[in-house]
Curated annotation (Swiss-Prot):
The chain crosses the membrane at residues 20-40, 90-110, 118-140, 152-172, 187-209, 225-245. One of its GO terms (cellular component) is plasma membrane. This is UPF0259 membrane protein YciC. Residues 41-89, 141-151, 210-224 are periplasmic. Keywords: Cell inner membrane, Cell membrane, Membrane, Transmembrane, Transmembrane helix. The gene is yciC. It is found in: Cell inner membrane. Its main location: membrane.
Length: 247
Protein backbone atom coordinates (compact mmCIF):
# COMPACT_ATOMS: atom_id res chain seq x y z
CA UNK A 1 0.00 0.00 0.00
CA UNK A 2 1.32 3.40 -0.97
CA UNK A 3 1.65 5.76 2.00
CA UNK A 4 1.57 9.51 1.48
CA UNK A 5 2.68 12.08 4.03
CA UNK A 6 -0.47 14.08 3.31
CA UNK A 7 -2.76 11.26 4.45
CA UNK A 8 -0.74 10.74 7.64
CA UNK A 9 -0.81 14.49 8.35
CA UNK A 10 -4.59 14.44 7.92
CA UNK A 11 -5.00 11.47 10.29
CA UNK A 12 -2.71 13.16 12.80
CA UNK A 13 -4.70 16.39 12.69
CA UNK A 14 -8.02 14.57 13.13
CA UNK A 15 -6.77 12.58 16.12
CA UNK A 16 -5.21 15.65 17.73
CA UNK A 17 -8.46 17.62 17.40
CA UNK A 18 -10.62 14.77 18.72
CA UNK A 19 -8.39 14.12 21.74
CA UNK A 20 -7.17 17.68 22.26
CA UNK A 21 -8.32 18.12 25.86
CA UNK A 22 -6.79 14.83 26.98
CA UNK A 23 -3.50 15.57 25.21
CA UNK A 24 -3.51 19.12 26.60
CA UNK A 25 -3.96 17.83 30.15
CA UNK A 26 -1.13 15.32 29.71
CA UNK A 27 1.10 18.06 28.28
CA UNK A 28 0.21 20.42 31.13
CA UNK A 29 0.79 17.77 33.79
CA UNK A 30 4.17 16.82 32.28
CA UNK A 31 5.15 20.49 32.12
CA UNK A 32 4.21 20.93 35.78
CA UNK A 33 6.25 17.85 36.75
CA UNK A 34 9.24 19.14 34.79
CA UNK A 35 9.12 22.59 36.41
CA UNK A 36 8.58 21.23 39.94
CA UNK A 37 11.42 18.69 39.65
CA UNK A 38 13.70 21.35 38.18
CA UNK A 39 12.90 23.67 41.09
CA UNK A 40 13.38 20.95 43.71
CA UNK A 41 16.76 19.75 42.45
CA UNK A 42 18.17 23.11 41.32
CA UNK A 43 20.56 25.11 43.51
CA UNK A 44 19.03 27.82 45.68
CA UNK A 45 18.79 31.43 44.49
CA UNK A 46 21.67 32.34 46.80
CA UNK A 47 23.85 29.63 45.24
CA UNK A 48 22.93 30.69 41.70
CA UNK A 49 23.85 34.27 42.58
CA UNK A 50 27.36 33.04 43.35
CA UNK A 51 27.87 32.14 39.68
CA UNK A 52 28.31 35.84 38.87
CA UNK A 53 30.80 36.52 41.65
CA UNK A 54 34.28 37.17 40.34
CA UNK A 55 33.72 35.61 36.90
CA UNK A 56 35.07 37.85 34.07
CA UNK A 57 32.30 37.30 31.53
CA UNK A 58 33.55 40.00 29.14
CA UNK A 59 37.02 38.48 28.97
CA UNK A 60 35.82 34.95 28.22
CA UNK A 61 35.94 33.87 24.59
CA UNK A 62 33.45 31.05 25.08
CA UNK A 63 31.58 28.80 27.48
CA UNK A 64 34.64 26.61 28.09
CA UNK A 65 36.75 29.61 29.11
CA UNK A 66 33.92 30.90 31.28
CA UNK A 67 33.73 27.60 33.17
CA UNK A 68 37.51 27.49 33.55
CA UNK A 69 37.45 30.93 35.20
CA UNK A 70 34.96 29.72 37.82
CA UNK A 71 35.96 28.52 41.25
CA UNK A 72 35.45 24.80 42.09
CA UNK A 73 32.38 25.74 44.14
CA UNK A 74 30.88 27.71 41.24
CA UNK A 75 31.56 24.83 38.85
CA UNK A 76 29.76 22.47 41.23
CA UNK A 77 26.75 24.81 41.37
CA UNK A 78 26.68 25.04 37.56
CA UNK A 79 26.89 21.24 37.28
CA UNK A 80 24.03 20.80 39.74
CA UNK A 81 21.86 23.32 37.88
CA UNK A 82 22.58 21.65 34.53
CA UNK A 83 21.93 18.16 35.93
CA UNK A 84 18.65 19.27 37.53
CA UNK A 85 17.43 20.81 34.27
CA UNK A 86 18.42 17.76 32.22
CA UNK A 87 16.94 15.24 34.67
CA UNK A 88 13.62 17.07 35.01
CA UNK A 89 13.26 17.42 31.24
CA UNK A 90 14.02 13.73 30.67
CA UNK A 91 11.42 12.71 33.27
CA UNK A 92 8.83 15.01 31.71
CA UNK A 93 9.59 13.80 28.18
CA UNK A 94 9.38 10.14 29.21
CA UNK A 95 5.99 10.63 30.88
CA UNK A 96 4.76 12.63 27.87
CA UNK A 97 5.85 9.96 25.38
CA UNK A 98 4.34 7.16 27.43
CA UNK A 99 1.11 9.05 28.07
CA UNK A 100 0.54 10.11 24.46
CA UNK A 101 1.29 6.67 23.02
CA UNK A 102 -1.03 5.04 25.57
CA UNK A 103 -3.76 7.54 24.64
CA UNK A 104 -3.43 6.43 21.02
CA UNK A 105 -3.49 2.74 21.97
CA UNK A 106 -6.51 3.07 24.25
CA UNK A 107 -8.50 5.17 21.79
CA UNK A 108 -7.63 2.76 18.96
CA UNK A 109 -8.95 -0.09 21.13
CA UNK A 110 -12.22 1.79 21.59
CA UNK A 111 -11.69 2.45 25.30
CA UNK A 112 -12.45 5.60 27.23
CA UNK A 113 -9.31 7.47 28.16
CA UNK A 114 -8.30 10.27 30.50
CA UNK A 115 -4.97 11.96 31.08
CA UNK A 116 -4.43 10.28 34.44
CA UNK A 117 -5.41 6.85 33.11
CA UNK A 118 -3.03 7.17 30.17
CA UNK A 119 -0.13 8.23 32.39
CA UNK A 120 -0.95 5.51 34.93
CA UNK A 121 -1.12 2.84 32.22
CA UNK A 122 2.27 3.95 30.90
CA UNK A 123 3.97 3.60 34.32
CA UNK A 124 5.46 0.11 33.68
CA UNK A 125 7.31 1.29 30.56
CA UNK A 126 8.49 4.65 31.91
CA UNK A 127 11.90 3.38 33.13
CA UNK A 128 12.73 1.98 29.68
CA UNK A 129 11.41 5.12 27.99
CA UNK A 130 13.53 7.27 30.30
CA UNK A 131 16.70 5.36 29.38
CA UNK A 132 15.80 5.39 25.67
CA UNK A 133 15.17 9.14 25.64
CA UNK A 134 18.36 9.72 27.63
CA UNK A 135 20.45 7.73 25.13
CA UNK A 136 18.73 9.37 22.15
CA UNK A 137 19.25 12.85 23.60
CA UNK A 138 22.90 12.06 24.34
CA UNK A 139 23.58 10.85 20.79
CA UNK A 140 21.78 13.82 19.24
CA UNK A 141 23.63 16.31 21.45
CA UNK A 142 27.00 14.74 20.64
CA UNK A 143 26.16 14.92 16.94
CA UNK A 144 25.13 18.56 17.21
CA UNK A 145 28.34 19.41 19.08
CA UNK A 146 30.38 17.89 16.24
CA UNK A 147 28.96 19.45 13.08
CA UNK A 148 25.21 19.90 13.82
CA UNK A 149 24.15 17.78 10.82
CA UNK A 150 25.00 14.40 12.43
CA UNK A 151 22.84 15.35 15.41
CA UNK A 152 19.88 16.16 13.18
CA UNK A 153 20.34 12.89 11.29
CA UNK A 154 20.40 10.95 14.58
CA UNK A 155 17.20 12.71 15.70
CA UNK A 156 15.51 11.58 12.48
CA UNK A 157 16.82 8.00 12.52
CA UNK A 158 15.82 7.39 16.16
CA UNK A 159 12.41 9.07 15.92
CA UNK A 160 10.43 5.82 15.73
CA UNK A 161 12.22 4.17 18.67
CA UNK A 162 9.75 5.26 21.43
CA UNK A 163 6.79 4.03 19.37
CA UNK A 164 8.45 0.66 18.73
CA UNK A 165 9.46 0.28 22.37
CA UNK A 166 5.89 0.77 23.59
CA UNK A 167 3.86 -0.71 20.74
CA UNK A 168 5.97 -3.82 20.10
CA UNK A 169 7.44 -4.10 23.61
CA UNK A 170 10.96 -4.08 22.20
CA UNK A 171 14.11 -3.63 24.23
CA UNK A 172 15.86 -0.28 24.33
CA UNK A 173 18.68 -1.08 21.93
CA UNK A 174 16.47 -3.25 19.71
CA UNK A 175 14.05 -0.36 19.25
CA UNK A 176 16.92 1.99 18.41
CA UNK A 177 18.33 -0.41 15.79
CA UNK A 178 14.90 -1.10 14.29
CA UNK A 179 14.10 2.61 14.18
CA UNK A 180 17.29 3.33 12.25
CA UNK A 181 16.55 0.63 9.67
CA UNK A 182 12.88 1.49 9.23
CA UNK A 183 13.42 5.25 9.17
CA UNK A 184 16.21 4.94 6.62
CA UNK A 185 13.84 3.03 4.34
CA UNK A 186 11.10 5.65 4.82
CA UNK A 187 13.20 8.81 5.12
CA UNK A 188 10.87 10.87 2.90
CA UNK A 189 8.01 10.30 5.35
CA UNK A 190 9.89 10.71 8.63
CA UNK A 191 12.46 13.45 7.93
CA UNK A 192 10.04 16.33 7.09
CA UNK A 193 8.02 15.73 10.27
CA UNK A 194 11.09 15.59 12.53
CA UNK A 195 12.64 18.65 10.88
CA UNK A 196 9.37 20.57 11.34
CA UNK A 197 9.35 19.51 15.00
CA UNK A 198 12.94 20.71 15.48
CA UNK A 199 12.12 24.03 13.80
CA UNK A 200 9.00 24.54 15.93
CA UNK A 201 10.92 23.75 19.13
CA UNK A 202 13.69 26.16 18.11
CA UNK A 203 11.21 28.96 17.42
CA UNK A 204 9.53 28.32 20.77
CA UNK A 205 12.91 28.49 22.48
CA UNK A 206 13.61 31.86 20.87
CA UNK A 207 10.37 33.29 22.26
CA UNK A 208 10.51 31.45 25.61
CA UNK A 209 11.83 34.51 27.44
CA UNK A 210 8.61 36.40 26.69
CA UNK A 211 6.64 33.89 28.80
CA UNK A 212 8.59 35.00 31.87
CA UNK A 213 6.67 38.30 31.76
CA UNK A 214 3.95 36.52 33.77
CA UNK A 215 6.06 34.94 36.51
CA UNK A 216 9.09 32.68 36.00
CA UNK A 217 7.18 29.61 37.24
CA UNK A 218 3.98 30.19 35.24
CA UNK A 219 6.03 31.15 32.19
CA UNK A 220 8.06 27.94 32.47
CA UNK A 221 4.93 25.79 32.76
CA UNK A 222 3.31 27.54 29.78
CA UNK A 223 6.42 27.23 27.60
CA UNK A 224 6.84 23.57 28.54
CA UNK A 225 3.18 22.86 27.83
CA UNK A 226 3.45 24.32 24.32
CA UNK A 227 6.66 22.36 23.77
CA UNK A 228 4.92 19.18 24.92
CA UNK A 229 1.99 19.78 22.56
CA UNK A 230 4.44 20.08 19.66
CA UNK A 231 6.09 16.81 20.69
CA UNK A 232 2.69 15.14 21.10
CA UNK A 233 1.76 16.00 17.51
CA UNK A 234 5.00 14.42 16.30
CA UNK A 235 4.36 11.28 18.38
CA UNK A 236 0.85 10.93 16.94
CA UNK A 237 2.24 11.29 13.42
CA UNK A 238 5.02 8.75 14.02
CA UNK A 239 2.64 6.24 15.63
CA UNK A 240 0.19 6.47 12.73
CA UNK A 241 3.00 6.23 10.20
CA UNK A 242 4.50 3.20 11.93
CA UNK A 243 1.17 1.36 11.96
CA UNK A 244 0.72 2.03 8.23
CA UNK A 245 4.26 0.87 7.43
CA UNK A 246 3.67 -2.38 9.33
CA UNK A 247 0.55 -3.24 7.34
Amino acid sequence: MSITAQSVYRDTGNFFRNQFMTILLVSLLCAFITVVLGHVFSPSDAQLAQLNDGVPVSGSSGLFDLVQNMSPEQQQILLQASAASTFSELIGNAILAGGVILIIQLVSAGQRVSALRAIGASAPILPKLFILIFLTTLLVQIGIMLVVVPGIIMAILLALAPVMLVQDKMGIFASMRSSMRLTWANMRLVAPAVLSWLLAKTLLLLFASSFAALTPEIGAVLANTLSNLISAILLIYLFRLYMLIRQ
